[in-house]
Design a protein with these regions (language model features):
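Flexible, low-hydrophobicity surface segments
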Residues: 1-159, 183, 266
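Glycine-rich loop/linker segments at domain edges
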Residues: 9, 15-18, 155-200, 289-375
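Short helix/loop capping segments that flank catalytic or ligand/cofactor-binding pockets
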Residues: 29-30, 52-54, 80-81, 117-120, ...
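Alpha-helical support elements that line or immediately flank enzyme active sites
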Residues: 43-73, 108-128, 200-267, 324-333, ...
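General beta-strand structural signal in soluble alpha/beta enzymes
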Residues: 69-73, 101, 181-185, 211-213, ...
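Short, surface-exposed loop/turn segments at secondary-structure boundaries that line and modulate
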Residues: 71-104, 139, 145-150, 220, ...
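Phosphate/diphosphate-binding loops
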Residues: 105, 111-113, 265-316
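Helix-loop-helix junctions that connect adjacent transmembrane helices in secondary transporters/permeases
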Residues: 146-229, 395-411
Length: 411
């Protein structure tokens, strides 16, 4: 494999026989002696998109059969965790002051069986003071209602803050164009839906946390677990067995996984958790969710010379990976396969009362492709030419030396 590239190289697959015959071993399949007599955790989730928590009543749930413990953020002593991308957007692993999307964990029930924990979770009553739910990006940008009061705005990140000089007024940027056309595109939100839902199991062995997790990024997960458990990486043994699909969403580490260690320590026995398909749809990080404003300009004979893209990224209710990753991956792919000499890309990330977004199959790159291809169609329609012919005129010419696009990508 010359230069480490798989292009033009036959790649032998070695992992298939196990999955086609005896089958893989996934996080919920793990049968380790250290997990003997494991209790089962089920999370109580918000049924509202946005609201202040007035009270959490667990009294009736504590009387349910098989219940071993019920915890809230207060009983676990959880402190707010600040986002590295926007410190003012801090939250606890279990919602404490208010809930910010449907499905956000509010409390956790630990019982002898999963069914007992599920039944008891139904008996936890949360009283809310309802707040306006922001589910539309443009509405969230204009609204006085804030997802995070301390942030001061629902726009929690903008590439202009990094000093990227890509915010030229349109009338100036497109001044030399014979033709300009604008568009507003919505690259819709998607849920990853891997065949294997999230699952995890935790136990303590000689003062060391041992935890199995379905993850695409074991080292990143190790960092998250270390931060959540006192900062001693040597005190954590994280194991990732076979993973039944993730599509990017399992790169993140989630509250439900991070809380199992403290629950197991408090209970003095192993604790397991497996989400339902409904929970996966609500809480496993979503993808895409990008609103795109495009302006494309050029000559009447079909040469595109200028292109501006302002991408509004829906971060969901948490300022996490989706806030940064997708927008940053959109920018370098903005030109697509076309030789467009003048390109500006600005991205703004906005929090809403929806499931947080994260990496998903390409993470910003397919969004960039969709934007430029739709813009090319608009341009072709405006000048009355065949879209295929307009594309042909603007394709990057055959090159032998490295080619650098207007957004800095080297081919």
């Amino acid at each position: 494999m010359a230069g480490g590239s798989i292009l033009g190289t036959r790649v032998q697959r070695k992992e298939d026989p196990k999955f086609l015959t005896s089958g893989g071993v996934y996080a919920d399949d793990v049968d380790d002696p250290r997990l003997a007599n494991a209790a089962q955790a089920v999370y109580v989730r918000s049924a509202v998109a946005h609201g202040t928590i007035l009270s959490i009543d667990i009294d009736s749930a504590l009387e349910m059969p098989g219940v071993l413990a019920i915890h809230t953020a207060e009983s676990l002593g959880l402190e707010p965790v600040a986002s590295p991308f926007n410190p003012a957007s801090a939250r606890t692993l279990l919602a404490s002051d208010k809930v910010r999307h449907v499905g956000e964990p509010v409390a956790v029930v630990v019982a002898e069986t999963q069914q007992q924990a599920t039944d008891a979770a139904e008996m936890v009553f949360v009283d809310y003071d309802f707040l306006p739910a922001l589910v539309d990006l443009e509405e969230a940008l204009a609204s006085d209602t804030l997802v995070y009061d301390a942030a001061g705005s629902n726009a929690v990140f903008d590439t202009t803050a990094l000093g990227l000089p890509e915010n030229t007024p349109a009338e100036e940027f497109f001044a030399d164009c014979e033709v300009t056309v604008t568009g507003r595109f919505m690259n819709q939100r998607v849920a990853p839906c891997p065949l294997e839902v999230r699952a995890s199991a935790a136990t303590w062995d000689g003062g060391r946390l041992v935890q199995w997790i379905s993850s695409q990024g074991a080292q990143g997960a190790k960092d998250a677990f270390t931060a959540a458990n006192g900062g001693d990486a040597e005190a954590i043994h994280l194991i990732t067995p076979d993973v039944g699909g993730g599509f990017g969403a399992k790169i993140d580490t989630y509250a439900e996984e991070l809380l199992l260690g403290p629950l197991a320590k408090q209970l003095g026995r192993p604790v397991r958790w497996r989400e339902t398909r409904s929970e996966s749809m609500m809480q496993l990080g979503h993808g895409r969710a990008q609103l795109q404003y495009v302006t494309i300009g050029g000559t009447k004979d079909g040469k595109v010379t200028h292109y501006q893209l302002h991408a509004i990224q829906d971060a969901g209710s948490f300022v996490g990976m989706g806030t940064i990753l997708a927008p940053f991956m959109t920018r370098p792919m903005a030109s697509g396969v076309y030789d467009i000499p003048n390109i500006e890309v600005r991205t703004t990330s906005v929090v809403t009362n929806t499931t947080p977004t994260t990496a998903y199959r390409g993470a910003g790159r397919p969004e960039a492709t969709a934007a430029i291809e739709r813009a090319m169609d608009l341009f072709a329609h405006e000048i009355g030419q065949d879209p295929a012919e307009v594309r042909r005129k603007n394709l990057i010419a055959k090159f032998t030396e490295p080619h650098t696009t207007a957004v800095g990508q080297v081919y």
